């Protein structure tokens, strides 16, 4: 994705005229769905029980036992190399301390490993991008679905900013709101108005947006719970709430131009009791190979067992932060005293550097893709890179991970960016990758348009099917058959073959989100570039209902029981009720 593209505004589409009659959007949708084969359809809707182990020492994988493990070659000055996967050449890496000094042999004091995504947090809600370390969520709880309709429950006006040649209204990619049902001790400690502090059902919306403000709202009503935190410079990505229920927010700055005023890049740490920033990581970093750009679009993961935050950056570094956090609810105080190390790396095709997607974690193994198309795996404990493969183009979409009896796999897709700029193939590649080896299992290609301002291809994170959908993974592909159009398709996890493919009249950068209902069924939500939110049946891809959010909605929604929250280019945050 281009780092400072002109943002295109889409006209509102509240109603259309079809056959001389004014009809609702849903009634005259021109989207078409083409069904395919479904040979691996599950016979049961049950999801196997997951391990609840959270001890990093027990979860950690012995790196030398991994299939195809190759010992690193020592190159001197703390630099190490390993061979690329399925192509010639080597990649290298180095680890730096917070004073930009090379660490010759990084030997951390403790192991860092994540458990099953159900163990990422005990706090109800959606606390990071797609909810957990596998990035397979985005929805919490179950919705009581009766009418299969959507209804706007509340709206919160928000602002905009402009930069040189760019316009940023409302919220955009990835822009997922955070929804958190605070523990009582945290709720009481934050200095909220009594009607929220004393309400056991209170759930808060925490939403960093383009205008450089963090909004805090009541999920039920949209009412402000505290004044917005204003850092002056815009957020593009998604923040993270501390998974222990501590009143700490972590969020990266995606824009440094506020109406002509240029500011510093920072990854920001917020104390939600004081309602202010208390620490930050500068984006322009001497250890980086990309010295001119310092944005942070990634949504951090926090390992609550070891008090460790991990955040990839657009400067090409990966930051590992020992938070040294303390929370005293009785004293109404929270503090951090961070210590950090930084991972720098490059592969044979590295030129641009920078990571815009959010890291995925399986035990002590972590995964990301970068602007040069490098998909790689590193160890969260030692920060050594274990394997790397090149996907052929920029990958901004966060991948999703699944552990199965057959292995551990990643689902990922790239966009048409670098190849389009150099006259190369204008194809988006969707892949299934073996997470332990980096080997490709299958690939599905879709032609997509190139535009340096608005990329085509995969920008949204795929939705991984579970239960009755466990044979499919759903991808959203932008700008396929025409510059304004797109496709959403369900692929068979085993083969990569199409289960269904839905042509979308208006393309989407938003991530499709699956939620559970009390009736035992699953439903899907996706938004598009004309501001339409679609409630669809993930079994078939067909719409059940739609509603207009005014303008382009490229942010990804979050869902808490019957409430959906997302903001659009119409400069509003919406609370939408599932009826």
What is the meaning of each model-derived region?
Residues 3-15:
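Bacterial N-terminal signal peptides that target proteins for export
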Residues 16-22:
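Hydrophobic helical h-region of N-terminal Sec-dependent signal peptides
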Residues 24-27:
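C-terminal motif of bacterial Sec signal peptides marking the signal peptidase cleavage site
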Residues 29-37:
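Bacterial lipoprotein signal-peptidase II cleavage site
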Residues 36-61:
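Post-signal peptide N-terminal segment of mature Sec-exported envelope proteins
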Residues 53-112, 136-173, 178-251, 255-296, ...:
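Extracytoplasmic/lumenal domain signature
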Residues 117-142:
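Predominantly extracellular/luminal regions of secreted and cell-surface proteins
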């Amino acid at each position: 994705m281009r780092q400072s593209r002109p943002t295109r505004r889409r006209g509102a589409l509240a109603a259309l005229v079809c056959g001389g009659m004014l009809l609702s959007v849903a009634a005259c949708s021109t989207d078409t769905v083409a069904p395919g084969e479904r040979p691996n359809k599950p016979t049961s809707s049950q999801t196997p029980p997951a391990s609840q182990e959270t001890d990093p020492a027990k979860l950690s994988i012995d790196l030398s036992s991994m299939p195809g493990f190759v010992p690193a070659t020592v190159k001197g000055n703390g630099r190490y190399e390993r061979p690329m996967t399925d192509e010639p050449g080597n990649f290298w890496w180095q680890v730096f301390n917070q004073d930009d000094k090379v660490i010759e042999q990084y030997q951390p004091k403790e192991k860092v490993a994540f458990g099953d995504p159900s163990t990422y947090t005990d706090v109800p809600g959606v606390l990071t991008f797609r909810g957990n370390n596998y990035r397979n969520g985005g929805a919490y709880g179950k919705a009581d679905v009766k009418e299969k309709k959507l209804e706007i429950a509340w709206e919160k006006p928000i602002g905009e900013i402009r930069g040189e040649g760019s316009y940023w209204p409302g919220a955009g990619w990835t822009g997922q709101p955070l929804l958190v049902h605070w523990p009582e001790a945290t709720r009481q400690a934050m200095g909220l108005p009594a009607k929220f502090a004393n309400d056991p059902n209170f759930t808060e919306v925490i939403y960093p947006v383009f205008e450089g403000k963090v909004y805090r709202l009541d999920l039920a009503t949209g009412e402000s719970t505290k004044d917005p935190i204003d850092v002056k410079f815009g957020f593009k990505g998604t923040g993270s709430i501390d998974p222990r229920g501590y009143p700490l927010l972590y969020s990266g700055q995606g824009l440094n131009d506020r109406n002509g005023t240029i500011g510093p890049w920072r990854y920001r740490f917020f104390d939600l009791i004081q309602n202010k920033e208390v620490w930050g990581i500068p984006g322009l970093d001497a250890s980086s190979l990309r010295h001119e750009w310092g944005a942070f679009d990634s949504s951090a993961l926090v390992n609550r067992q070891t008090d460790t935050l991990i955040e990839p950056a657009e400067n090409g570094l990966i930051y590992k932060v020992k938070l040294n956090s303390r929370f005293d609810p009785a004293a109404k105080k929270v503090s951090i005293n961070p210590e950090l190390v930084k991972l720098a790396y490059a592969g044979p095709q590295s030129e641009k550097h920078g990571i815009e997607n959010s890291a995925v974690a399986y035990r002590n193994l972590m995964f990301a893709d970068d602007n040069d198309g490098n998909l790689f795996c590193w160890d969260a404990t030692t920060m050594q890179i274990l394997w790397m493969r090149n996907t052929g183009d920029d990958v901004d979409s966060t991948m999703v991970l699944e552990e199965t009896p057959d292995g551990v796999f990643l689902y990922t897709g790239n966009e048409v960016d670098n190849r389009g700029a150099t006259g190369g193939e204008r194809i988006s590649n969707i892949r299934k990758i073996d997470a332990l080896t980096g080997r490709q299992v299958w690939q599905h290609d879709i032609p997509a348009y190139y535009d340096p301002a608005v990329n085509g291809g995969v920008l949204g994170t795929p939705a991984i099917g579970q239960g009755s959908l466990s044979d499919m993974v759903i991808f959203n592909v932008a700008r396929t058959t025409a510059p304004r159009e797109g496709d959403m398709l369900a692929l068979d996890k085993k083969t990569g073959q199409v289960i269904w493919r839905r042509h979308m009249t208006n393309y989407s950068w938003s991530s499709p989100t699956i939620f559970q209902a009390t009736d035992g069924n699953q439903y899907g939500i996706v938004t598009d570039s004309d501001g339409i939110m679609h409630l669809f049946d993930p079994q078939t891809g067909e719409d059940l209902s739609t509603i207009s959010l005014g303008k382009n909605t490229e942010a990804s929604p979050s869902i808490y029981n019957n409430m959906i929250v997302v903001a659009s280019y119409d400069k509003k945050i919406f609370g939408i009720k599932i009826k």
